[in-house]
């Protein structure tokens, strides 16, 4: 999955627009996310392992907010021939086009239906696994309960939702510490202070992270009885909920 180096915010911008998953971002996304999200590679790898354990024959897998298809590829490699279909959805046409190229580079018996659309409009049915990999944080907070409810209803008994997100923390000291560690991570990966500052400004109005408690409360309120935080590095985490 090739990608150019992310230099989107390397030059000073007079007016910083809100972050969007356009052609410019799609072209550098693989580099951007791996230099910005600690543990991203581990999360992607483990999605495949979870799929191997939980995806059942003749079911659907949903990758909601699929971007370049990293999660879909990891899942497809691990589930083998189970007569399943993966439905990979993103609202960015640029992401979908590049995802199609990435998927085409690997031969598999598992078909992938690529959908350019709003995940809030997608029907979830006969699902054994649903993935929201750093997606929900970009949804309007008022839309999140309804999405989780739809996912829960569309999952088969024993099916899983894997939810990866940046987290907020109620304890301001913990928030400050983990923010600082994350900034150090980005600096160590070659981002300048200008890039970090401008990227933060672009995300300010479009990314609204929840706390871990908010995620757990939402999932259990919609019916999930089993919930676990299986991965965390700094203020980035991945959770699994089982129906």
UniProtKB/Swiss-Prot annotation:
Q: Which CDD domains match?
A: AdoMet_MTases
In short, the EC number is 2.1.3.-
Q: Which domain of life is it from?
A: Bacteria
Question: So where does S-adenosyl-L-methionine get bound?
Answer: 40, 65-67, 90-91, 118-119, 133, 200
Q: Which reaction does it catalyse?
A: prephenate + S-adenosyl-L-methionine = carboxy-S-adenosyl-L-methionine + 3-phenylpyruvate + H2O
Q: Which residues cross the membrane?
A: none
InterPro entries listed in its UniProt record: CmoA (IPR005271), Methyltransf_25 (IPR041698), SAM-dependent_MTases_sf (IPR029063)
EC class:
transferase
What are this entry's molecular-function GO terms?
A: carboxyl- or carbamoyltransferase activity; S-adenosyl-L-methionine binding
> Subunit details for this protein?
Homodimer.
Known role:
Catalyzes the conversion of S-adenosyl-L-methionine (SAM) to carboxy-S-adenosyl-L-methionine (Cx-SAM).
Please give the family membership noted in the entry: Belongs to the class I-like SAM-binding methyltransferase superfamily. Cx-SAM synthase family.
| Record-given protein name | Carboxy-S-adenosyl-L-methionine synthase
Q: Which organism is it from?
A: Shewanella woodyi (strain ATCC 51908 / MS32)
């Amino acid at each position: 999955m090739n990608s150019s180096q992310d230099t989107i915010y390397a030059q000073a911008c007079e007016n910083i627009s809100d972050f969007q998953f356009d052609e410019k971002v799609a072209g550098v996304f693989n580099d951007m996310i791996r230099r910005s999200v600690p543990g991203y590679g581990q999360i992607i790898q483990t999605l495949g392992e979870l799929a191997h354990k939980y995806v059942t024959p003749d079911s659907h897998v949903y990758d909601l907010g699929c971007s370049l298809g990293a999660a879909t590829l990891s899942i497809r490699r691990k589930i083998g021939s189970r007569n399943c279909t993966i439905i990979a959805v993103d609202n960015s046409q640029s992401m979908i086009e590049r995802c199609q190229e990435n998927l085409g580079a690997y031969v598999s018996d598992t078909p992938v239906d690529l959908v350019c659309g709003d995940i809030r409009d997608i029907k979830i049915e006969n699902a054994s696994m649903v993935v929201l990999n750093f997606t929900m944080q970009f949804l309007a907070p008022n839309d999140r309960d309804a999405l989780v409810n739809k996912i829960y209803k569309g999952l088969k008994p024993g099916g899983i939702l894997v939810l990866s997100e940046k987290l907020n923390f109620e304890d301001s000291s913990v928030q400050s510490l983990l923010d600082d560690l994350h900034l150090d991570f980005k600096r160590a990966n070659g981002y300048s202070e200008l890039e970090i500052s401008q990227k933060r400004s672009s995300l300010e109005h479009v990314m609204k992270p929840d706390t871990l408690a908010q995620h757990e409360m939402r999932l259990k309120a919609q019916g999930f009885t089993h919930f676990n935080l299986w991965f965390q590095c700094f203020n980035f985490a991945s959770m699994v909920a089982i129906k």
